[in-house]
Amino acid sequence: MAKNKDVRVTITLECTNNCAQNNEKKKLGVSRYTTQKNRRNTPTRLELKKFCSYCNKHTIHKEIKK
């Protein structure tokens, strides 16, 4: 039997804005999304513009290591 490498992997996207360090907001935390990507089509780290509930605006979310 041949080894089957996972082509589609589950990744985590994290907000790049400093939501946790912003003292003006009442909510403190980090916005994270989980999604899947195809390793063959996108070998580099993924960056998507998603809504951050802590910043209350659309910000860039980058792929993080697990």
Swiss-Prot record:
This protein's record includes keyword DNA-binding: no
Entry-linked InterPro entries: Ribosomal_bL33, Ribosomal_bL33_CS, Ribosomal_bL33_sf, Ribosomal_zn-bd
The keyword Cell inner membrane belongs to this UniProt entry's keyword annotation: no
Pfam families found in the cross-reference section: Ribosomal_L33
Keywords (A to Z) from UniProt: Chloroplast, Plastid, Ribonucleoprotein, Ribosomal protein
Gene Ontology molecular functions: structural constituent of ribosome
GO biological process: one example: translation
Cellular compartments annotated: Plastid, Chloroplast
Organism encoding this protein: Physcomitrium patens (Spreading-leaved earth moss)
The protein, known as: Large ribosomal subunit protein bL33c
Assigned protein family: Belongs to the bacterial ribosomal protein bL33 family.
Lineage: Eukaryota, Viridiplantae, Streptophyta, Embryophyta, Bryophyta
SS bonds (residue pairs): none
Coiled-coil boundaries: none
Main location: plastid
SUPFAM superfamilies named among the record's database cross-references: Zn-binding ribosomal proteins (SSF57829)
NCBIfam families recorded: PRK00504.1, PRK00595.1, rpmG_bact
A GO-annotated cellular component: ribonucleoprotein complex
